[in-house]
Amino acid sequence: KGFHFSVLKNSWLVGFSDQALLVMGPVVADAQAQLQQQMVKYLKADEDEGITASPMFERLETITSPMAMVAQAQALPEKFVAPFTLGTPKDTDPSQVVIAAEMDVKDGILQVKGETFSFNKEIDEALKKAAQTYRPIKGSYVKSMPADALAGIFMNVKGEQFLPMMQSNRSLQTLLMGINQAIDMDNIIRSVDGDMAIVMPSLTDNNMQMTMAAKLSHAKWLGDVDYWKTSCPAGAKIANWGKNAYFYTDGKTSFYFGVTDDKQFFSGSDQLMAQYAVKPSNHPIDAKIQKLIVGQKLAMVINLAKSSGSDGSGKDDAISTVTGLLTPVFGNLTSVVYTLKVKR
C-alpha cells in the first residue's frame, strides 16, 4: 500500500512512496517479484532501522558531489578489483574494502574520483599507508595506451615501497603467476623509480595479455638473467631477443621483456606489444583521458567500447557487466576513468 513500482530498461526496479525513491538492480525478469518484496521492506523501514542507518549510507551522506557512490570492492567485476585492494593485508576479503567516490560524466567519460577505506581498523590503516606510496603521475606512458586497449593502470612509485603491496595483492599475483616461476619479477619491481603503467589489451581468462612499462633507477638485475636461464622450470626457457632484451616461453605463456638505454623497463605478451609498451601509440587514448591521468596518484582507465575481441568474437563479460550497470543511469559512455582521491 502506498508503494509504486516500475521497471527501467528491463533490468532496474524503481520503487517509490511519498517519502522515498529506491532503485535496485540489475535484476533478471524472474527475480523481479522477489526483489520487489525486499524493496517494500526497505521503503517501509523507519530511519532508525532502514538502509539509511547503515555505516555505508552514512558515508554516502558525507560526499558533497551531486552524484556519489559507496560500494564494496567485491561488487566490482573481479578483473578490476586490483587497484582498489592494493596495500591491504594478504588475505583481505574484497568485501572488507569499501570505495567512496564522487562521479561526474563529461564527453562520454565517467570520471570517478574515489578513496578506499575499511570499517576494519587494521585494513583501513594499511590502505592509508598505501596511499602515501603513490607520487604524482608524470604521464610518461599515457600516450602508450592504445585507444582500443581494454584497461590501463597508471602510477608513479618507488619500487622498494611498492613491492610489498604487490606481493600481498591476489589479483596482481595471479596476473604474474606464470612468469614469476622463471623471472624474478620482485627484483625488477624493486628497481622501479618513477612512472609505471600496466596495460591490458584484452582480458579473457584463456587469453591474458598485458604490457608493463616503468622508469627504473637501475637495471642491475640484468646480471641475473643468465642464472634465470639455467633455473627455468621443465619445458620452459629464456632466450636472448635483442640488446638487453629477452623472452620467456613455457609453451603456453610468452613474455618478452627488456631495458632501454635510458633505463625504461618494457614488457609484453609478444615482441611487438613489448616494444611498444614504452613508445607512443599510433592511436592513443583520447587526449582528454590523458589529461585526467597526469598529476594524479593512481589512475585506472576502462574502455567500455572494447566490448568484443579483435576478431569480433564474444563480449568481454566484465565489460558487459560494467556497461549494463552504467548505461541506464548515465547514457552511452565510452570510458571510465578512476583516480585516487588523496586527502589533503
What are these regions (language model features)?
Residues 17-19, 25-27, 43-156, 160-162, ...:
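Leucine-rich, highly hydrophobic segment in Treponema pallidum outer-membrane-associated proteins
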Residues 2-9, 80-95, 132-133, 179-192, ...:
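Short, solvent-exposed secondary-structure boundary motifs
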Residues 51-81, 91, 129-229, 239, ...:
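Extended non-catalytic domains of envelope/secretory-pathway proteins
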Residues 1-56, 190-291:
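Single conserved position on a long alpha-helix in the C-terminal lobe of the eukaryotic protein kinase
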